């Protein structure tokens, strides 16, 4: 068995619509839907935009963590479309959670003081230049921004 190795894929900056759609308390926790308004991504092998075509079905859990469930599209700079889906977790202190309603305050939080991780998967056309993404399991390290969220995404080798 070998150690985990990664390869940097891209950094993505996603803009989320305000206000979020608040469902409220459910048997599973407090549900919110954050709509993707747009964004950009760029890396050594791929770059492009994130059209307004997806969202994050966020669940604030009873244990104080946040479960994320994202589905979105990526459009490469050469016109190809890629579907991405990922789950993940955000874990932060109750004081930090209080900043989530204010984007400027959320961006001011030091990302090293909270845990924000994702596990992206991709679907690309099998006959296209990004078919290699169909075989990638990735991990993302996230941070909160004034416009939404940003991630550095790495392929697991």
PLM-predicted stretches and their roles:
Residues 1-157:
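Beta-strand-enriched cores of mature, soluble protein domains
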């Amino acid at each position: 068995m070998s150690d985990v190795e990664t390869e940097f894929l891209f950094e993505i900056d996603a803009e989320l619509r305000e206000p979020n759609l608040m469902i409220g308390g459910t048997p599973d926790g407090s549900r919110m839907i954050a709509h993707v308004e747009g964004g950009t991504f760029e890396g050594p092998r791929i770059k492009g935009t994130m059209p307004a075509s997806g969202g994050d079905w966020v669940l604030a859990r009873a244990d104080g963590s946040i479960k994320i469930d994202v589905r979105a599209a990526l459009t490469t700079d050469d016109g190809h479309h890629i579907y991405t889906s990922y789950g993940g977790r955000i874990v932060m202190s109750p004081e930090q959670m209080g900043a989530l309603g204010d984007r400027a305050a959320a961006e001011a939080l030091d990302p090293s003081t909270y845990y924000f991780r994702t596990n992206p998967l991709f679907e690309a056309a099998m006959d296209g230049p990004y078919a290699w993404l169909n075989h990638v399991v990735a991990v993302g390290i996230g941070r909160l921004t004034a416009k939404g969220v940003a991630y550095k995404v790495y392929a697991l080798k």
